Amino acid sequence: IIVMANVIKLRKGLDINLTGRAQEQMLPVKSSTEYALVPDDFPGLTPKVTVREGDHVRAGDPLFVDKGCTEVSFASPVSGTVTAVERGERRKVLRVKIAADVQQEYADFGVKDVAGLSADDVKASLLQAGLFGYINQLPYAIATRPDTEPKAIFVSALRDKPLQGDFEFELNGQEKDFQTGLTALAKIAKVYLGIGAKQSASALTGAKDVEVTVFDGPCPAGNVGVQVNHIDPVNKGEVVWTVDPTAVIFFGRLFNTGKVNLTRRVAIAGSMVKQTGYVDALVGTPLKQILADNIADGCNVRILNGNPLTGVIANEESVLGAHTSEVTLIPEGDDVHEIFGWMLPRFKDFSTSRSYFTWLQGKKAYNLDARLKGGERHMIMSGEYDRVLPMDIYSEYLIKSIISGNIDSQEQLGIYEVSPEDFALAEFVDSSKLPLQKIVREGLDILRKENA
């Protein structure tokens, strides 16, 4: 009998049911000859490229390092020849492109038994293999550094944002690597694993070397920041690490095989996908290979590297992000023209305020497009944010203090325990149409510079 961990019930939040959820079936992927790693996938990173065009790299060899902490490197997903280091304005590194070898060659870091490793051994192994940068931290919601001392490590296996991939489906066949990754992290600090009330995989409910907590409630119960807030909040001067569950699998593969394997199971979802499902693809795979012949016709499409709430706008030339668990396709909406807007009675549109009759239809699935349906306007203090943000903070006052640049007020209002994704739902329901995630990201970046 597995004794279930403590259950935390959340009332605040909002589940947005969209059409096009990924079916639990595997889809074919056309093999790619070119891959790329994007530094912007790792927030807080200032990259310094360590390879040149024409260099040959193995899977696991470093492509770039963090200029502020050069021992943190970032591994190539494939072996091959570096074809380009693409740069943007002010020579910002946009991506490092690699032409893949036909026969893949892996850097060998040696199989290790994590049970006999120390915390320093685990850190050294992740640093050597270029995987340490997949660990994020609070405060600031950035890629962490090895000299930070976390009071705890949080892993959330609950993905509950609209159209997000199901981690239990991704976990099939990866249970051993997942447990090895958890055990390795537990050598560094206490690990809290957050799971959903409907998740039943034994690799989650019976995970060893961690404290399992069940979160029962609507989105954003799966946000790791929400889980931190309810289990062990971050105060000024404290640090917690947060790790994506797929990155835990990456770590486990490293210790079990001695190789860097950045293959992840990604959901292909959204109303503009012909056939929804899952693909196994490497980080850095071009989206045109993942989405080949699977984009529906009929209107302009918005491709998202991620989910509709927190995903990054992409195109077919973009590559699969390092932390991306789904690729989502929704209508752009730029070819839709309506009169009278919200004044018309509507039977297909979603409303959080019950302005339309659709709330009477229960758990109806909606086909929403990417339109804002309104312009940015003055901030309205209406309590909208608090209704969908189950955290013990004054969210509206925090946003106002970030906009005004009042750092003392930000610290008092709890900025150290938030990340941009925590405000994704608030951004969705916001009557003022403010880019809340962007505001929070800029506020955290300014605060980090002030405290440096």
Residue ranges and their predicted role:
Residues 71-79:
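Short coil-to-beta-strand transition motifs
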Residues 2-50, 65, 215:
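N-terminal, Lys/Arg-enriched amphipathic/low-complexity engagement segments
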Residues 51-65, 84:
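Short, well-structured beta-strand-loop connectors
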Residues 72, 86-452:
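Buried, small/hydrophobic-residue-enriched core segments of structured protein domains
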Residues 45, 51, 68-71, 275:
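Short, solvent-exposed loop/turn positions at domain surfaces
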Residues 61, 67, 78, 86, ...:
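Glycine-rich, histidine-containing beta strand-loop boundary motifs that form or position
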